[in-house]
Every structure is written in structure tokens, then in C-alpha cells.
């Protein structure tokens, strides 16, 4: 089914993927599932992820902060965990290629994900071992702690936003503007060295009561223009201090995860 045909359904169920204390979405829950409970051997933080595609016992929920530790522990083998400045904001970016993993962890596949500052808000991508970000297994996701989240109902604000699309070293970046009174979110991300060179939000609307947003997107890049995109995401924190979301396209190589901090 085409992504554009899914838009109304996604808007209708924009809160269907909420967990106790966590809001999050995966573009393909057969591959990646977002949750709030990490198992005892992989704790840390609140937001957690399960690699459903790996099967038992590798599909247990793992805290994102635990995955950050994995990215730090195997740096000599090719993983990385670094702080990146975008505008005036800091994002912590983790890169975990399957080629750097010991055999005991190879079933976990490939991870690129970011954290918005020090908040419990994450966004990223995954694909199977042996695949590429252009393959059908390319999955984007976000997860965040929704505790004490509030969204203003008047005024405007800008967000410095980073996007992940096929690379942890080449980020998309840009500014989103939220009009709290009108309930709209707009902006564009641009970058180089990724399948997507620009991604623009088109008619994205949000409900301050649920803090969720949804709408359409257009991307341009290595395969030309794709206007089939659907955006879904969430504000997090007091006065909507952060946001995260995903954009899905008919061309899965254009699928992008993003997160942002309020200026």
C-alpha cells in the first residue's frame, strides 16, 4: 500500500503507539518496536527498543542508554558515540554497525540513533545485517519520556532539528517553527552525504492535548523528488521543550528520523 494512502489512518491512530510513560513509533514493528521496559541485563533510562526481527532471545527490550554504552564500548571495532552541535544545540549520536559487533550481538543489526540533549528523547534508524539503508528492512523510529509533557496553546517557537537518514556522520539539520495557537508545525531539513538532501514538512498539524503531530512531507535526494511522505511525531517535556518524529516515503531510502530542541 502506498504511503500516501496510509496518511488518514496514521493521523487517526496518532496516539495508538503510546506506552506507559513513553510515546514512540516505528515505521515497521516487525523489525523494531518501541517500549518502556528494559530487561534486567540491559537497563538504563526509560525509553527502550526491541529488535523484533532478531527473534528470541535477542528481541528483549533494551534501554537506549544501554545501547549508548554499547556504542562506547566497541569504539575500537568501529562503533561511535559522540556529541554533535547543530546550531546552538547538542545531540548525542550513536553509530552501531553490525560489522563492529561480536557474534553474540550480530543479530541486533545496524543502529544509528540520536538523543536530544540530555532529555530522554531518542530518534534513529535500523536495518538488518547484510542489508543497506536502501533496503526494505530500513526502519525509522523515535521514543521519548512523556512524563510532565505540556504544550502551549498560544504563541510560536522555533526548534533546532537534526535528522538521521542512512548515516550517523552526515546529519540533516534545520529549523522547525511551531505555531501553538494554530496547531501547526513547519520547516525544512537539509544535508549532504545522505539519500535525502532536503525534507520539508507539508501541512503538519498537532493537538496540544495529546502533544502528537502528523502531516505530509516532501523529500528530494538521490532518487529525485518524492512527495509521498507521511510525518508523525510528538512533543516532549514541559512547554514542549523537545520534539521527535519520523517521515516515511514510498522510497524507503528516504525514510528519516528527526529530533529537535526548543530555542
UniProtKB/Swiss-Prot annotation:
Signal peptide per UniProt: 1-20
Induction: Part of the hemO gene cluster.
InterPro entries linked: HphA_C, HphA_N, OMP/PagP_b-brl, Slam_hemophilin_C
Superkingdom of origin organism: Bacteria
Subcellular location(s) per record: Secreted
UniProt entry keywords in alphabetical sequence: Heme, Iron, Metal-binding, Secreted, Signal, Virulence
Classification via SUPFAM superfamilies: OMPA-like
Function: Part of a high affinity heme acquisition system. Functions as a hemophore that acquires heme from human hemoglobin and delivers the heme to its cognate receptor, HphR, facilitating transport of heme across the bacterial outer membrane. Apo HphA interacts specifically with human hemoglobin and steals heme through a passive process probably due to its high affinity for heme. It can also acquire heme complexed to human serum albumin. Plays a supporting role for full virulence, acting as an accessory factor that enhances the process of heme uptake.
Protein name: Hemophilin
Organism: Acinetobacter baumannii
Taxonomic lineage of the native organism: Bacteria, Pseudomonadati, Pseudomonadota, Gammaproteobacteria, Moraxellales
Amino acid at each position: 500500500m502506498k504511503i500516501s494512502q496510509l496518511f488518514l489512518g496514521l493521523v487517526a491512530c496518532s496516539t495508538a503507539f503510546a506506552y506507559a510513560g513513553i510515546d514512540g513509533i516505528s515505521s515497521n514493528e516487525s523489525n523494531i518496536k518501541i517500549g518502556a521496559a528494559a530487561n534486567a541485563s540491559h537497563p538504563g533510562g526509560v525509553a527502550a527498543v526491541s529488535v523484533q526481527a532478531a527473534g528470541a532471545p535477542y528481541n528483549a527490550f533494551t534501554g537506549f542508554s544501554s545501547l549508548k554504552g554499547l556504542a562506547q564500548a566497541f569504539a575500537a571495532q568501529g562503533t561511535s558515540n559522540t556529541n554533535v552541535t547543530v546550531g546552538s544545540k547538542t545531540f548525542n549520536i550513536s553509530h552501531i554497525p553490525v560489522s563492529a559487533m561480536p557474534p553474540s550481538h550480530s543479530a541486533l543489526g545496524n543502529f544509528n540513533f540520536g538523543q536530544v540533549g540530555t532529555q530522554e528523547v531518542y530518534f534513529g534508524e535500523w536495518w538488518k545485517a547484510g542489508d543497506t539503508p536502501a533496503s526494505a528492512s530500513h526502519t525509522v523510529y523515535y521514543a521519548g519520556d512523556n512524563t510532565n509533557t505540556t504544550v502551549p496553546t498560544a504563541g510560536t517557537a522555533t526548534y533546532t532539528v537534526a535528522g538521521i537518514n542512512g548515516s550517523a556522520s552526515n546529519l540533516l539539520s534545520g529549523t522547525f517553527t511551531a505555531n501553538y495557537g494554530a496547531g501547526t508545525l513547519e520547516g525544512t531539513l537539509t544535508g549532504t552525504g545522505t539519500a535525502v538532501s532536503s525534507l520539508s514538512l507539508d501541512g503538519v498539524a498537532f493537538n496540544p492535548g495529546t502533544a502528537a503531530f502528523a502531516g505530509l512531507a516532501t523529500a528530494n535526494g538521490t532518487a529525485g523528488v518524492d512527495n509521498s511522505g507521511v510525518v508523525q511525531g510528538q512533543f516532549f517535556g514541559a512547554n514542549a521543550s523537545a520534539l521527535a518524529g519520523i517521515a516515511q516515503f514510498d522510497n524507503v531510502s528516504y525514510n528519516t528520523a528527526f529530533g529537535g530542541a526548543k530555542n
